[in-house]
Amino acid sequence: MHRTFYEYLMTLRNPNDHSEIAEFAKNAFLDQSFPKQEKDYHRLSDYLELNGNYLPSMAVFDETYRAYEASESTGGDSYQ
């Protein structure tokens, strides 16, 4: 994996999209403490469990992280 999860997440920001994942991306952008250099699922999950009160459910993170892993394994931006 070359880019960080945060870098991937920022590709999902869209002010016209009100999906849970787009909202997650927007709120992570506003979260000045978000671990921007992190790639590890468990470290990110631990951070969000303690600080991600903007996430309606950890399932949103899980879905986004799976898409991140898929995009990194194919070398592109894939989100379904």
Swiss-Prot record:
Domain of life where this protein originates: Bacteria
SUPFAM superfamilies: YozE-like
Family assignment from sequence similarity: Belongs to the UPF0346 family.
Protein name: UPF0346 protein LSEI_1394
